[in-house]
Amino acid sequence: RGVRVTGTEIVGLVPKRALIEAGKYFLRKQRRSTGIAEQEIVRIAVRSMGLDDLKPFDPAEKVIEYLLEAEDKQKRLIDMTCKGFAEETASESPAPGGGSIAAYMGALGAALGTMVANLSSHKAGWDDRWEEFSDWADRGQALLGELLHLVDEDTAAFNRIMAVFAMPKSTDEEKAARSAALQEATLYATQVPLRTMKTAFGVFEIVRAM
């Protein structure tokens, strides 16, 4: 669908946003939906700009955000396999619980709506509607990303409350600090599922449109 740049090279590191914008630019030039997975957008940017023609281009080693994520050794639920996540939920650990599961179910709903939008964007006979479906897919990807984030955020909020219960309470000062921390942690633990509900509700608009 056009001439592709060959032999481009990036010296040093590159912000993820730059590759995302480049990938979406080339997708629009091809009249394709931009509401696809981030990794696929990056792959399209790399290929379209010829970043892997001169030598292999590994986004994990060249993109700033990916390097920072690799240095973060904290275990995330969303990095587990479906089987592993289910088994972790079934274990004797109190987390992940219903909040994380609800966020993941919402993410799957957003993923399904986004899938239909992407399929529709290049369906034969609907060529003049590709931008409409691309916009729906973009919205679906945004909701999907937020709900996946909330999977871990809900468990993190629960763990904050558990951490407060471990705080000392021998003196009046310690009791006051513990009480204040518990109030703050409990408030946040209610705000996260509220965000999940609001975000998941937004998925219905996409599903209805599809």
Regions found by a protein language model. Name each.
Residues 1, 89-116:
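Conserved phosphate/anionic-ligand binding catalytic regions in large, soluble enzymes, centered on
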Residues 2-80, 84, 91, 169, ...:
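Long, contiguous binding/interaction regions
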Residues 78, 82, 90, 94-101, ...:
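Disorder-to-helix initiation segments
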Residues 79, 109, 113, 144, ...:
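Hydrophobic faces of stable alpha-helices that mediate helix-helix packing
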Residues 101-108, 136, 143-150, 189-199:
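Amphipathic alpha-helix face/heptad-repeat signature
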Residues 154-210:
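Amphipathic alpha-helical interface segments
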